[in-house]
Amino acid sequence: MADLYALTQQALAGMDVELVDVERAALGLLRVTIDKAGGVRIEDCEQVSRQLSRVYEVENIDYKRLEVGSPGVDRPLRTEAELRRFAGERIEIKLRQPLDGRKVFSGILSAPANDGAAADAQPAVFGLEFEAKKDDIQVLNFTLGDVERAKLDPVLDFKGKKR
């Protein structure tokens, strides 16, 4: 069987959606997560579901149920391109190795300073502006290789007040 992620990505080429993840879950569930500039609508999920159902049938991909959805507000970030795309946003990262006895940091992501031609030769160094202690803002510099997992971490205001 071909690489399921690559097959799915190829099937979605030209559909104006970005493949975020493909996951096999219990009881034959195949979960596909997509994203799109401006947000994913139900029509996008329906269109992707129809397309993938046909492709998976032709490619003999074994599944009982296909679920297509958006990554939600706490979208995972797995590539340098995704980190660059969400520069300026609040994210949470978990480091592979602890720094000052701590692995999890939340703050505002800044784009790498070494963007450009040199970025191909060396991994991009991103910055995360976080509050170490009350009113003590620090910047953590990291590469994608330092990160075990990263995700968007928006501050949601359910009271309806503007900040």
UniProtKB/Swiss-Prot annotation:
Main localization (coarse): cytoplasm
Location of the protein in the cell: Cytoplasm
Keyword Cytoplasm on entry: yes
Any Pfam family the entry gives: DUF150_C
Keywords: Cytoplasm, Ribosome biogenesis
CDD domains: YlxS_C
GO cellular component, one term: cytosol
Listed GO biological process terms: ribosomal small subunit assembly; translation
InterPro entries (alphabetical): Ribosome_maturation_RimP (IPR003728), RimP_C (IPR028998), RimP_C_sf (IPR036847), RimP_N (IPR028989), RimP_N_sf (IPR035956)
Signal sequence segment: none
Stretches that traverse the bilayer: none
Family: Belongs to the RimP family.
Function: Required for maturation of 30S ribosomal subunits.
Record protein name field: Ribosome maturation factor RimP
Organism field: Bordetella petrii (strain ATCC BAA-461 / DSM 12804 / CCUG 43448)
